[in-house]
Amino acid sequence: MNLHEYQAKQLFAEYGLPVSTGYAVDTPEAAVEAAKKIGGNKWVVKAQVHAGGRGKAGGVKLVDSYEEVAAFTQNWLGKNLVTYQTDANGQPVAKILVESCTDIANELYLGAVVDRSTRRVVFMASTEGGVEIEKVAEETPELIHKAIIDPLVGAQPYQARELAFKLGLNPTQIKQFTKVFLGLSQMFHDYDFALLEINPLVITDEGNLHCLDGKIGIDSNAVYRQKKMQEFHDPSQEDEREAHAAKWELNYVALDGNVGCMVNGAGLAMGTMDIVNLHGGKPANFLDVGGGATKERVAEAFKIILSDSNVKAVLVNIFGGIVRCDMIAEGIIGAVEQVGVNVPVVVRLEGTNAEKGREVLANSGLDIIAATSLKDAAEQVVKAAEGK
């Protein structure tokens, strides 16, 4: 679960970190009032969506009049912002953040993630702020400095100082950086973050550190115990199909291909996507129905896949270990009858009750293509998606 920038900065402020004075608004009139309340003659207005690249897409602007504040707000509210991190439809803008203007002398990067290789929270800092950190990591990895947090003792001031030295900060800035570092680490622990980024963490003209942006991702497995984070949840920023799938305990991720995939098990699902790609197809989704799939969940999974208008064919690939193939077959039949499928369906069943499952499908009277192997299934579904 992700947070909006204004929500992240609200948390930063609660932990005593330096952020700009700002207000999240949902009308042009409220935006003008926010600018008046902030004061000054320049403001930054930012469209609030769960995606990076807003500036290049026109979703962030420096303005110097109340008319511009109102015009920007009027222009973006209710519209979708498309960036390099969104799909072609973009994400809806329901809030605009109006902030005071900050003079920038230098831009840094500070972030933290849960690193699976070390099984620790790892902080990363770089002098290359304001750009995509992935690009920095790929092209100049030596410019990214790391601090690994021991979960038994937590973040320590000396770790902050080590990073600050590598960033070339002066003594006053080192003290400020230490406060920011320790505050972020505590916040990361308190709210079960999975990702945290301040990009950029700027040095102002006065030489002070300032959190100019904020990106936070919450561990979805921990949201149930984070009541405050639940209040920050914005369902409008989620893919409708993904949100619907989550209610049925289905692991679904929308992609941009035309071959719908329904598989049991994450590993098999990824392997299925790979083999579809290998044979010239493009998966429209990742969907894992899980080992404890029921007939109802399978039917719902089928409906979710078919709700994507880009899907031209569906591949059902089931290995019956815990789940029974005949039950999956009944779910497929139920879904096809309910939804009214008008695209080819290729089914590959192996494992527990596979023969019975194939028999159920064969006797259903439905136009379902039976595959004899995984390779055969991939070849058949790619051909079907191409209309061959």
From Swiss-Prot:
Family according to the record: Belongs to the succinate/malate CoA ligase beta subunit family.
Cofactor requirements of the protein: Mg(2+)
Record field: catalytic activity: succinate + ATP + CoA = succinyl-CoA + ADP + phosphate; GTP + succinate + CoA = succinyl-CoA + GDP + phosphate
EC number: 6.2.1.5
Protein name per UniProt: Succinate--CoA ligase [ADP-forming] subunit beta
Gene it is expressed from: sucC
Subunit and partners: Heterotetramer of two alpha and two beta subunits.
Keywords, alphabetical: ATP-binding, Ligase, Magnesium, Metal-binding, Nucleotide-binding, Tricarboxylic acid cycle
Cofactor note text: Binds 1 Mg(2+) ion per subunit.
Residues covered by the ATP-grasp domain: 9-244
Binding site for substrate: 264, 321-323
Residues the entry annotates as binding ATP: 46, 53-55, 99, 102, 107
Pathway entry: Carbohydrate metabolism; tricarboxylic acid cycle; succinate from succinyl-CoA (ligase route): step 1/1
Disulfide bonds: none
